[in-house]
Amino acid sequence: MSVRAAVVGLGWAGRELWLPLLREHADFEVVAAVDADPASRQAFTKATGIPTHAAVSALTAREVDLAVVAVPNYLHTEVAGALLATGISVFLEKPVCLNSAEIDVLAAAERSGGMLLAGSAARYRGDVGALRRLLPELGEIRHVALGWIRARGVPRAGGWFTQREKAGGGALYDLGWHLLDTLAFLLGPAAFTQVIGVTSDDFVNAGAWRAAWRQDQLGADAADVEDTARGFLVRDDGVSVSLRASWASHQARDVSVIHVEGSAGTADLRCTFGFSPNREPEPVLSVTREGTTTRLPVPLERIGVEYTRQVSDLAAMLADPGHRGRAVAEARPIVSMIENFYASAGSARGRGAVPAYQ
């Protein structure tokens, strides 16, 4: 029997990403959508024939098995918590929530209601899977360097995405969460015992550095979040982690990099996460031992196939009671780390933005 799904939020992610994925998948039937904007609801129903509602209170567990929540970050906990409380299971991509208090709210709602599912699609990439399978050959893992660095990729500058009150933060929440979730997939989840971070915002208010491929409109307000976050972290298993998340930079293409150092060798993956067309030509995975670097085969996949795999996994996860509580357990150390990261960045002596790149 198909999973009856509702899409909550008809912005870019809900409309262009999750809706097509769910409608094209044999395990799901999209039975409803929710959006506060009347025009969006009208256009959606006219185009799809699927009924829409103004609020999640119109959804019930008798009619909906799973709600895919794609609303602005600051609404994640309010919306997901309300759905869970009615017995409807919820999928959130990232960020699951914005702070530790919110993760407690979601944990309580899940204990008495529906199941919370979460996770980045990056862990479903074929090249990331190949890297994970390689890790046992590297011996004891000592250090991981993670980066997602866009050339020109500021999302909707001036909109909610770049307003701290609504987004929670900038590139660290948007791109960094994917990297940290991928780290947990590679090494297993762990708390971070040491966190040092700095942020900068040289590009975020320069229109020329926005993500043109998203076709976002510029907002009226100046952005007050970082476009770049750089940090050094230590996990409670002793593995050190360097992290860089950047919406914009001076490089030519958008790139995602994972470098793993072990006692018996190192591994490097260079690719491009997400949907940007300004990407690396192909993923490159290599291993280095005793001065010799060997390139390893990785699958060439269509852009976005990781999201298709993620949706395929959702139905199985929903049917497995063992997944209850897992999303909260994996999100909690990430949320705590981000809180400590921003605290560290706030205590650093600020040098101010240099918005010279117009």
UniProtKB/Swiss-Prot annotation:
It comes from the Bacteria. Pathway: Antibiotic biosynthesis; rifamycin B biosynthesis. InterPro entries: Gfo/Idh/MocA-like_OxRdtase_N, Gfo/Idh/MocA_Oxidoreductases, GFO_IDH_MocA-like_dom, NAD(P)-bd_dom_sf. GO terms for biological process: antibiotic biosynthetic process. Disruption phenotype: Cells lacking this gene are unable to produce rifamycin B, but production can be restored to wild-type levels by supplementation of the culture with 3-amino-5-hydroxybenzoate (AHBA). It holds the Pfam family GFO_IDH_MocA_C3. GO terms for molecular function: nucleotide binding; UDP-3-dehydro-alpha-D-glucose dehydrogenase activity. It catalyses: UDP-alpha-D-glucose + NAD(+) = UDP-3-oxo-alpha-D-glucose + NADH + H(+). Its EC number is 1.1.1.-. SUPFAM superfamilies: Glyceraldehyde-3-phosphate dehydrogenase-like, C-terminal domain, NAD(P)-binding Rossmann-fold domains. Keywords: Antibiotic biosynthesis, NAD, Oxidoreductase. PANTHER family: BILIVERDIN REDUCTASE A (PTHR43377:SF1). Interacts with RifK. In a complex with RifK, RifL may catalyze the oxidation of UDP-glucose to UDP-3-keto-D-glucose, which would then be used by RifK to produce UDP-kanosamine. Is not able to use dTDP-glucose as substrate. This is Putative UDP-kanosamine synthase oxidoreductase subunit. The gene is rifL.
